[in-house]
Amino acid sequence: MLTIKDLFVKVESDNGEDREILKGVSLEVNKGEVHAIMGPNGSGKSTLANVIAGKDGYEITGGEITYEGKDLFEMNPEERAREGVFLAFQYPVEIPGVSNATFLKAAVNEIRKHKGMPEMDAVEFLKFIKEKMKMLGMDQGMMNRAVNAGFSGGEKKRNEIFQLAVLEPQLAVLDETDSGLDIDALKIVAGGVNNFRSKDNAVVVVTHYQRLLNFIVPDFVHVLVDGRIVKSGGKELALELEDKGYEWVKNNEQFVMTNE
């Protein structure tokens, strides 16, 4: 589904100089899989998520990303979304004056139009939305509120997962969705992601801590350090990181040299 080959990315730093963030990242994600990207702060995790989604501000200096056999760099963010790429932001954006209902109905019908399907009318959409809200234990009053405006941190993250459930993308990229959540909110968010998982889609979970992976169990774990994937493994790798810390891989020359 998603193939990243030898990806190099740089950004312009505050002093105007270019800074290389990703330094030859390669990754293969197939349908039905959940991949966790872990790493210390500043390792390039969010950069990778943002580049997949097509966020502005990054310069691709090498490599390629293909999604369902198509060149992702040839698509703008809106085209990627219509093709089924979804990004749950680390810091969800507020859209004052636009209700969740209006936003999601427009998004759903845009995707349906892209697939050659008829638009949902108001009655169909309301029934569809109520089913999703019930599944996630969401208050129906959320639909009348402006997108993320005045929401608490936990409400914003739950709203992102609600959008995931409604839009039903093929590839979901979750950028530190667990950031700032208490254990109850974390369980709700993880439950929404687990309900989404199927043999027909894939999930990339970007996280700093192992605790999210207690609830969303990954098939593969990749450790990103200084813009490089220095180690990959199964779910047990996350537990090993929790026990030994990131210094374990940062200071182990064998890991770094193997991936240079």
Task: Describe the residue ranges of each PLM region.
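ABC ATPase NBD Q-loop/coupling interface
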Residues: 64-80, 148
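Helical segment within the ABC ATPase nucleotide-binding domain
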Residues: 186-199
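Walker B catalytic motif
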Residues: 173-177, 184
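Conserved structural motif at the start of ABC-family nucleotide-binding domains
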Residues: 2-4, 20-22
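ABC-family P-loop ATPase nucleotide-binding domains
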Residues: 93-170
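The feature captures the beta-strand-to-loop junction immediately N-terminal to the Walker
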Residues: 38-40
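Conserved beta-strand-loop-alpha-helix hinge in the C-terminal portion
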Residues: 220, 224, 228-251
